[in-house]
């Protein structure tokens, strides 16, 4: 596996992946051009990295010479999981998620109700809806809470 703790020099690449992935996946849901193409900029993310992405101490990157994705997980929750779109479909997201489960104790995460691709991805890795939901702040879009159980638990 090529997963390691994120370092300060990773911030720019992480911000780039975050911005592109947000535009690709969330603009079709929210349709907010001003946010997606004016406010959401790599420079803005870098300027307030911990607000947009989180603390580096809770971030891990897939790096095989190219930083291809990252996960931010703490307190039993996955807060961010992004893989550069050019490298998706290679098992990197699954490896990062499994790392978060095994190494950080991740057992829950929130996903947009309309993000069906993400829901399917998480379901393949054992994260299922709990029935709990909330609105994404400042929007009418719902976030669903997904929870993971150790295979064999509850059976």
Question: Where are the predicted features?
Answer:
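Conserved GNAT acetyl-CoA-binding A-motif
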Residues: 103-114
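A short beta-loop-alpha structural element at the N-terminal edge
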Residues: 2-16, 25
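Conserved acetyl-CoA-binding loop-helix of GNAT-fold acetyltransferases
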Residues: 83, 89-102, 120-124
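Terminal substrate-recognition subdomain of acyl/acetyltransferases
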Residues: 144-155
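Conserved beta-hairpin
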Residues: 56-69
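Conserved catalytic-core motifs of GNAT/GCN5-like acyltransferases
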Residues: 110-112, 128-145
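Conserved GNAT-fold acetyl-CoA-binding loop/helix
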Residues: 22-49
